[in-house]
Curated annotation (Swiss-Prot):
The modification N6-(pyridoxal phosphate)lysine is found at K249. Signal peptide: none annotated. CDD domains: AAT_like. The keyword Membrane does not apply. This is LL-diaminopimelate aminotransferase. GO terms for biological process: lysine biosynthetic process via diaminopimelate, diaminopimelate-aminotransferase pathway. It catalyses: (2S,6S)-2,6-diaminopimelate + 2-oxoglutarate = (S)-2,3,4,5-tetrahydrodipicolinate + L-glutamate + H2O + H(+).
Length: 416
């Protein structure tokens, strides 16, 4: 009899987004006339930049000629893409990152989970609360936690609350932890970390031999000057941090699939016998064994992001979604609903009005406004009493959704 991975049985019933989809489908079936506006899952809506489309079309044509046909690509991704990434995303910000330290992949979500393949099972892991559910669930699947308690918190994880009181930036752990997940700009709260805050984390990690897993998927949305876009802008980060990036939310690649992970060659981890091993070699071995790379066509599209035209077009996309976020923030504030985020991130973190729970507010929005958000409690117990709205939508949908919410919640009185 084949045995299953019993750790999957510890997962809370239903991943957050499938549960949202289930409720929305049930409502849509019962009310087929309803025009539902989905502002929950952070999927982009606007077309791929023209520069990317043109590059991909050209690459398709190359695949039709024997002389320019490409088969399996390099395990880390093509050098021309990695060079462009290193030059534009890191070296331009005085980050000491080389193209050889970049691994191209088909998604930062995948990499955030797959990185656990090279880490041991006895690490103490710290996550913020609320948090992107993938960080938690992949550790549960890998057997790094015990069961969940009645609050949905897993034994073995160290939860670091991020609240309005601490400006949605967690304090350093009071105990020693081995692995730390940080996401800035933050999903779901939209908060950013100052240089000083990140320096504190880097100093902590170096003092305790900890590893920071830094998710920078939304760095392109940072508008405030002086806010770091990369953990490697912080002195000492090369010795303690891995960074995840994605083209999904910057260049609209959610359906095209391209991302990258940075593993500095100076980064070390400890083996069971006490020896030190460089994580770059482990990650290279893992990727070479389990991943065949991103398609040549998609990598050419990603390379075009760094062209002059591509940079202008991507900036246009980012500004479009940030304007959506501004509209959401402004309209909700005008009817007395407290909001956070949406300035340096495409997400607006909404305080539920009238003492409603996260799921109660979700259901009220769905049933009375025909608008879908993401319940804050789905991101962790500290997210209870909040709901995330995504700016990834058409301008018409955002304006209509805010009109509907405004008509229902005028004078909600949730300003804090």
């Amino acid at each position: 009899m084949a045995r299953i991975n019993d750790h999957f049985l510890k997962l809370k019933t239903g991943y957050l987004f499938p549960e949202i989809a289930r409720r929305v489908q049930a409502f849509a079936t019962a009310h087929p006339e309803a025009q539902i506006i989905k502002m929950g899952i952070g999927d982009v809506t606007e077309p791929l930049p023209e520069a990317c489309r043109t590059a991909m079309i050209r690459a398709v044509e190359e695949m039709g000629e024997r002389a320019t046909f490409r088969g399996y690509g390099p395990e880390q991704g093509y050098e021309w893409l990695r060079q462009a990434i290193a030059r534009h995303d890191f070296q331009a910000r005085n980050c000491d990152i080389d193209a050889s330290e970049i691994f191209v992949s088909d998604g930062s979500k995948c990499d955030c989970g797959n990185i656990l393949d090279i880490l041991g099972h006895d690490n103490t892991i710290a996550i913020t609360d609320p948090v992107y559910p993938v960080y938690v669930d992949t550790n549960v699947m890998a057997g790094h936690t015990g069961p969940a308690n009645e609050r949905g918190e897993y034994e073995g994880l160290v939860y670091l609350p991020i609240t309005a009181e601490n400006h949605f930036t967690a304090s350093l752990p009071s105990q020693k932890v081995d692995v730390i997940y940080l996401c800035f700009p933050n999903n779901p709260t939209g908060a950013v970390a100052t240089r000083e805050h990140l320096q504190n984390w880097v100093d902590y990690a170096r003092a305790h031999g900890s590893l920071i897993l830094f998710d920078a998927a939304y760095e392109a949305y940072i508008t405030e000057p002086g806010i770091p876009h990369s953990i490697y802008e912080i002195p000492g980060a090369r010795e303690c941090a891995i960074e995840f990036r994605s083209f999904s939310k910057t260049a609209g690649f959610t359906g095209t699939r391209c991302a990258f992970t940075v593993v500095p060659k100076s980064l070390r981890g400890q083996a069971a016998d006490g020896s030190w091993v460089d994580l770059w070699s482990l990650w290279y071995r893992r990727q070479s064994t389990k991943f065949n790379g991103v398609s040549y066509i998609v990598q050419r599209g990603a390379e075009a992001v760094y062209s002059e035209a591509g940079q202008a077009q991507v900036q246009g996309l980012v500004q479009f979604y940030l304007e959506n976020a501004r509209i959401i923030r402004q309209q909700l504030a005008e009817v007395g609903i407290q909001v956070y985020g949406g300035v340096n991130a495409p997400y607006v973190w909404v305080k539920t009005p009238d003492g409603l729970s996260s799921w109660e507010f979700f259901d009220k929005l769905l049933h009375t406004c025909h608008v879908v958000g993401t319940p804050g409690s789905g991101f962790g117990s500290a997210g209870e009493g909040y709901l995330r709205l995504s700016a990834f939508n058409s301008r018409a949908n955002v304006e209509e959704a805010m009109r509907r919410i405004g008509s229902v919640f005028a004078g909600a009185g949730a300003v804090g």
